[in-house]
């Protein structure tokens, strides 16, 4: 549905926070979809022609305290990383401190001007999208093959030859099975981002675009071979 994952509440929201979340959401569109919260860790599987080519662990926008700087200052420090930019022109996106992030801080009992204790991690978003300041970690080589096969089957069932499959997995050490998949699919993205798999904050990264080009222009790929 091309949703933005605007506000996510792990615990039941107060009426005031719920109203604020709706206010923020309706500023983006004329309709809002409210979905059930699914606990676990989110992974993006990139599927091409029925095969999993990459798996990404996306970590929500966050800062870690040093006992000296405010949350606002920590965000500025993190945004100084040359890997971060705007409008999808860099591997990672700038972290904002807008209404959504401040609502998230309020839920945790913080304000942007609070100083976090050393080592204290605070999330600024519930959703782990790279486009909202999240971090990308390539876990293709370590993700159990059962989940890769399941994600590929989901994309194939929808007739999508290129697809991003988002799975929430509570415990990735427990293999998926037909009887118990041990995961929940929260999205099938038919226009998946590729650069985040190649230029990761951590991990080796996976070359995706060249395989897409080979698919679209097989005559060129054949000539090169």
Positions of PLM-derived features:
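Detector for Asparagine
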Residues: 1, 17, 62, 79-81, ...
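Active-site nucleotide/adenylate-binding loops and adjacent lid/helix of ATP-dependent enzymes
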Residues: 1-96, 144-148
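Glycine-centered flexibility motif
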Residues: 3-5, 40, 119, 132-134, ...
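Generic hydrophobic/packing signal
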Residues: 4-7, 55, 101, 132, ...
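Long, highly charged amphipathic alpha-helices
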Residues: 20, 149-153, 207, 211
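A long amphipathic alpha-helix within ATP-dependent nucleotide-binding catalytic cores
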Residues: 23-29, 78-174
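C-terminal active-site "lid" helix and adjoining low-complexity regulatory extension at the edge
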Residues: 135-142, 156-162, 169-225
């Amino acid at each position: 549905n091309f949703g933005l994952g605007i506000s996510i509440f792990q615990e039941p929201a107060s009426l005031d926070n719920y109203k604020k979340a709706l206010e923020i959401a309706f500023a983006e569109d004329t309709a809002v979809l409210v979905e059930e919260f699914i606990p676990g860790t989110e992974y993006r599987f990139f599927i091409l022609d029925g095969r999993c080519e990459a798996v990404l662990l996306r970590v929500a926008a966050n800062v870690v305290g040093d006992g000296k700087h405010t949350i606002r200052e920590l965000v500025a420090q993190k945004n100084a990383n040359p890997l971060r930019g705007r409008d999808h022109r860099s591997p990672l996106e700038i972290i904002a401190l807008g209404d959504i992030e401040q609502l998230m801080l309020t839920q945790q009992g913080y304000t942007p001007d609070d100083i976090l204790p050393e080592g204290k991690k605070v999330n600024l978003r519930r959703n782990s999208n790279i486009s909202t300041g999240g971090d990308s970690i390539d876990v293709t080589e370590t993700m159990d093959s059962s989940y890769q096969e399941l994600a590929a089957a989901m994309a194939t069932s929808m007739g999508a030859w290129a697809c991003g499959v988002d799975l929430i997995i509570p415990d990735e050490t427990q293999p998926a099975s037909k009887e118990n998949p041990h995961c929940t699919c929260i999205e099938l993205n038919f226009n998946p981002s590729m650069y985040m798999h190649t230029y990761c904050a951590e991990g080796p990264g996976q070359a995706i675009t060249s395989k897409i080009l080979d698919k679209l222009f097989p005559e060129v790929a054949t000539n090169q071979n």
